Amino acid sequence: MQFGKSLLKHVYTRTFKSSLTCSIFAFTLLMIFFVLDWKRMNVYPRLDEIPGLNVLRAWDDLQEITKSPHPYNSHASDVVRNYILEELYKLKKQDEGNVEVIDDLSSTTTFIMPDTNIRSYFEGSNILVRFRGDNERLRPILLSSHFDSVSTGFGATDNGMGVASALELARYYAEHKPERDLIINFNNAEEDYLYGARAFTEHEWSKNVTAFLNLEGAGAGGKALLFRSTNNHVARSYFKSNRFAFASVLGIDAFKRGVIKSETDYVVYEKMNNGTAGLDLAFFRNRGIYHTERDDIQHTSIFSLNHMLVNAFISLRNLLDEKSQHFKGSSPLYFPVFGSYWQINLNLHLFLNVVFLIACPAILFMCLFRFPSLYAQLKKPCYLICFTLSSLFVLIFDYVVVQSLTKLNPYVIHSSPDAVLAFFFLTNLLGLVYSFRYVATHSRMSNEELSCIEIVLIWYVSMFWYISLLIATLTSIVRGLGSLYFVNFGFFCSFFCCILTLIRVRYFVDRMVTINRPANPEQMPLVQSTSGNAYGTSRYPQHRLKAVVSKSASVKLNDNLWSVLFFSCLVPLPLFTCYNLLSEVFIPAVHQSLIDGPYSNTCYKFAVILVFMAIINSSPFVFRALSKKSSAILLMLWVSLLFNILRAEPFNEKAPIKFRVFQHLNLDTSENLFHVQNIEPYTQKVLNDYPKIISDTSYQCVDRDCFYEAEEPTLGFDGPLQNAINITLHKSLNSSLAELRVDAFETKWCYFDFSVPVYVDSINGFEVQEEHQSLRLGVRNFGTPFVVKTVAKDEDSPTNVTVTCMWDEFDHDKIPSYTSLLNYIPAWSVLTKNSTGLLKMSKTHVM
C-alpha cells in the first residue's frame, strides 16, 4: 500500500510539475476522444453482417442497373424496369399466397406545382410489391426507392444503391414473413419532379400506409446518412440495435429552412394520408460528381452499398416489428457523443433549456456570494476588458480571413475542405493566443491578477455560453430547430467547471491564505502567489512564515493539476461536438455546392463561427499552455497553411467543377443554342479553347449563362426536325371546346405555355376544369399523344401556345453538341443536366 502511494505521488509530481507536461497530457486526452469518435465514423458493417442478406448479389444488381444512363424519358429506363420486374416475379413464384406484384400502368396524377399556377399531369409506371404479414390488423410499412437516373449520370449512388438494397430486402422478406404487411414501391421519374412518388399516392395501397422508409442518393458514395425523420418515435426504429448508425439532425433543419433546395420522395410521403411518419436514408458526400457521368460503379464501393443495406434492414425490421398501430411523436433530436448516438424529444430538450437558463445562474450567484475573494476578482474591469476585446479581435480576425479567402481563392473549400477547416481552427487559436497576450500585457495586470486569470476567464466563458444558450433556445422555439444542441454542451461544461472553481477556491486556496488574510475580504488573493507572501513582510513568527512558504512551494504543482482538470472538463466535449457537426455533415454536404447557384461565402462564415465556439473554451488556458516560442511556431504553421490554401487548385479530378448544360432549338426561328452555366473564370477556361466555338461569333456569356451555336440534333428522326413536333387543333362546331393535340417523336415530356390563361377542360381524358397558363405533361409510353381540351373565351382574340418537348438520350450521337463537349472538357470538370431535358425543342401555334 505504501509503495502504491509513493508510486502514485511520483507519477503525479512528474506529470504535472510543468506546463509542457500538462499540455502533453491535455493533448493526449483530446487524442483519446478523437480515436473514440474516429472509430464510430469509420466503422463499416461486415459483408456478412446480417444472415440472409447477400450484398454480393445486391452488387450484381447494381452493376446491371447502372450499365447506362436511364432517365424516365429514355428506352434504357424501360430496360431497368423490366429487370426489376423479372426479379420480383421470381419471388412471386416462390410464394404466390404471400407475395403480390403489381406492374402499375394505371396510376395517373395531376396537381398544381407549389408556389405557381402550373398544372402538372403525369402517367405513372411504378412497380409495387406487397409481402403479407402475420398480423393483418397492423397497418403496412412502405419501403420506397426510385429507379430512374438523371440523363447525365449512370445513377450508381442516385439511386442504384437504393434500388439494389430494396431488391435484396425484397428477397429477404420473400423468405422471412414480416410481422405486418410490407409494401415496396420501385418508382419512376423522381428526378424530374418526384412524379413517381406522387403517382403512388393515387394507388389504393397508399391509403393505409402508417410509416415509410425512403432510400435515396443526394451525393455519390460514402456512408448513408439518416437525412430526415418525421418524429422521435420513428427515429428510434433507426437507432435501435444499430451499431452502424450515421445521422444528423442538421439535415432536418437544412430542409426546413430551405438551405437545401433539392427534395426527395420523403416530402411527398410525409404528407400522404394527412401525415405519415417516415425516415429518409440517403448518401450525401461527393456532390461534385453527383448527377454526372462519374456517378458510376467505378466511383463507389461495395462497402457503401452494404452500409445502406444494413441500415435499411435494421430500420425496416424495427418498423415492421413495432406493435403500435400509429407512429406518432414529437420532433426528433439526435446527436453523436464520443462513439454513440443520443436521442431526446426536441420539446423536452427546449423545456430543459428554459429550466437550465433559470436554475444554473441562480445556483452560481448564490454560491458566489459565499466567496467574496472570487466575487471581488470577477468585478474587476481588467478581466472583462481582456475577455471582451480578445473575443472581438478573434471574430474580426475571422471575418477578415474569410473575406480575404473568398476574394483570393473563393472555391478552395471545394477540393480542400479538411485544409480549410484546419486553417480555421488555427486562425481562431492564433487569434486567441495573441489577442489575450497583447491585452493582458497592455492592461497592466499585476502578477496576482495574472495568476488568477484562469479561474476568472472560466466564469466569463460560462457567461458567453449562457448568452449563446439563451439565443439558441429562443431561435429553436421560434423556428423549431434542433441542430443548435451543441450550445448545450458548451454551457453545461462551463457551468460544471465554474462549480469546480468554487471547490478549488474553498478547499485548496482559502485555507492556505488564512495566515495573512487582510481585513477587507475583497483584498484577499484568489490564488496564492508562488513567490511567498503576496502582501509584503509578514508580522507572524518566522516558523509560521516558513510553513506558509513550504505550502506555497507546491502551489505551482497544484495549479498545473487544476488546470488539467479544468481543461478536461471544459474543452474536449464542446470542441468535438462542434467538430463533429462540421466534419461529419456540414462540410461534406456543402463544400461542393458553391457552384450550384450564385456564389455565396455563407458556408465559410458558418464554419468559422462554429470553430470560434469550439475554440473559445480554450481561452483560459492559453497563458499556461502556450509560451512565446510555442506561439511563434503556431504562427509559422498558420502562415504555411495559408500559403498552401491560397495556391491550391479549387478543382481537380477527384473534386471536379460541375457545369449545368442544355440545348434549346427554336423550330420557328431555327435558333439553335447550347447553354453552359457560367462560373467565372472556369467556364471561360474550358470554352475559350474549345475548337468548335473558336470562330463562333454567337458565343457570349451573360450573367450566369454562356451560349454558342449548337449542332443540329439527330434523334434518329427521318425527315426535317420541324416535323418532330406536330401540333394540330380541332375546334368543335357545336361547343366552345377546342382539342389541342401534340404528337412528338420519341419523347414522354412536353410543356404547354399559353400567351394568356386558358380554361383547361381535360388532359389526355383526365378531367381538370380549371384555368391555367402553363401545363407540364408526362406520358407513360413513347408515341402517346399529348391532348389538351380547352374552352375558348373570346374567338376574336387569338391565343398562342408554345409547346416545348424534351429529349434526354444522347447515345448514337443524338445530341452531338453535348457528346462533343463531354469528350473535350478537362479532367477537372464534368457536365450535368440543367433541368428536365438535355435537348429542348419548342414550337409555337396560333389557336
From Swiss-Prot:
Its EC number is 3.4.-.-. It is an enzyme of class 3 (hydrolase). Residues 1-17, 370-381, 437-454, 504-560, 627-630 are cytoplasmic. The chain crosses the membrane at residues 18-38, 349-369, 382-402, 416-436, 455-475, 483-503, 561-581, 606-626, 631-651. InterPro entries: Fxna-like_M28_dom, M28_fam, Peptidase_M28, PFF1_C. GO terms for biological process: proteolysis. Its main location: membrane. Zn(2+) 2 binds at D158, E191, H291. It holds the Pfam family Peptidase_M28. Residues 39-348, 403-415, 476-482, 582-605, 652-847 are vacuolar. The active site is at E190 (proton acceptor). Signal peptide: none annotated. The record marks Y290 as: Transition state stabilizer. Keywords: Glycoprotein, Hydrolase, Membrane, Metal-binding, Metalloprotease, Protease, Transmembrane, Transmembrane helix, Vacuole, Zinc. Glycans are attached at N208, N274, N726, N734, N800, N834. SUPFAM superfamilies: Zn-dependent exopeptidases. GO terms for molecular function: metal ion binding; metalloexopeptidase activity. It is a multi-pass membrane protein. It is found in: Vacuole membrane. PANTHER family: METALLOPEPTIDASE M28 FAMILY MEMBER (PTHR12147), VACUOLAR MEMBRANE PROTEASE (PTHR12147:SF58). Belongs to the peptidase M28 family. This is Vacuolar membrane protease. It comes from Schizosaccharomyces japonicus (strain yFS275 / FY16936) (Fission yeast).
